[in-house]
UniProtKB/Swiss-Prot annotation:
Keyword ATP-binding: yes
Family membership: Belongs to the APS kinase family.
Entry GO MF terms: adenylylsulfate kinase activity; ATP binding
Protein name: Adenylyl-sulfate kinase
Length: 200
């Protein structure tokens, strides 16, 4: 990978501003940053939230961690430096979506506080951290992709929660507890926050 920075570039201002797009869409651009262990319910809740918001007439886009590794991040592995670059790229993409006035939902384990804080710095007021709280015992029991078993057997290295750490959010804007609340209640809690903060 060529790490040389671009030179001789100038930011191009456009005639249509973010506020124009938000006015047309009747919504505020935002980034709902879902974080939690594998199997905690990030994708499940995010997908249900996107569907609910769509039914309510809002424009959304879901950036899924696995899906982006098929394209944009296909050159990255799961070592610490790759995870950091993964989150950096996603943050930049999410920033573009928010600027377009879109409610952007990201579902990434994003295990490191520093990486999430860097995303928060880049995205500013658009960043809404959504902690999908679920004990590892429950996640491992669910194991929808069969990867906890592989990690326990040593077939997968650097697996979050097993041989790589997950750093819980310190002050997330939203916490949903998927191990005791229904999918519907989790979605309703997030929507209530979005309404209270005039994103919807």
């Amino acid at each position: 990978m060529n790490n040389k920075k671009s030179t001789n570039v100038v930011w191009q201002e456009t005639k249509i501003k973010r506020q124009n797009r938000e006015k047309m869409l009747k919504q505020k651009g935002a980034v709902l940053w879902f974080t939690g262990l594998s199997g905690s319910g990030k994708s499940t809740v995010a997908s249900a939230l996107e569907k609910k918001l769509y039914e309510m007439g809002y424009l959304t886009y879901l950036l899924d961690g696995d899906n982006l590794r098929y394209g944009l991040n296909s050159d990255l592995g799961f070592k610490s430096e790759d995870r950091t670059e993964n989150i950096r790229r996603v943050s930049e993409v999410a920033k573009l979506f928010a600027d377009a006035g879109i409610i952007t939902i990201t579902t990434f384990i994003s295990p490191f506080i520093e990486d999430r804080n860097n995303a928060r710095k880049l995205l500013g007021k658009d960043f809404v951290e959504v902690y999908i709280d679920c004990p590892i015992e429950v996640c491992e029991k669910r194991d929808p992709k069969g990867i906890y078993k592989k990690a326990r057997n040593g077939e997968i290295k650097n697996f979050t929660g097993i041989d790589s750490p997950y750093e819980k959010p310190e002050k997330p804007e939203i916490t949903v507890e998927t191990y005791k609340d229904t999918e519907e209640k989790c979605v309703d809690n997030i929507i209530e926050y979005l309404k209270q903060h005039k994103i919807l």
